[in-house]
Amino acid sequence: MTNVQTQEKEKESKLQDKKSIMHIFSKIMHEPEILGNDREFPLETDDFVEPFHRVIFGAMKNLYNDGADTIDVIDIDGQISNYEVPYNIFNQNNGVEYLQTIKETLPPTNFELHYERLKKY
């Protein structure tokens, strides 16, 4: 990655609305079927700038694709623990605590608003 590319990634990371990401993760944990609505709300790993968020979203998407009706913190941790580098990223960012806080404190509301904010950047 060139210096210019690195600077662009850092800029994108600062612009991305982290609260919206947290609300999106809350919605997915409470209602994973939202990931099946690709026509109205297409979400991909590339929508997330930070590796930490990419790891979490990738695990959620894999769990949904494997048929999970619900997704909780233990499921996500278990999914990521199979892969050394992503699991290190997850743990270095206190992933379990981060997701527990999201699930316990953020209601899965206003998804459309947060989705639009995520897609804006």
Q: Language-model features: where?
A:
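Noncatalytic partner-interaction/assembly domains of nucleic-acid and motor enzyme complexes
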Residues: 1-121
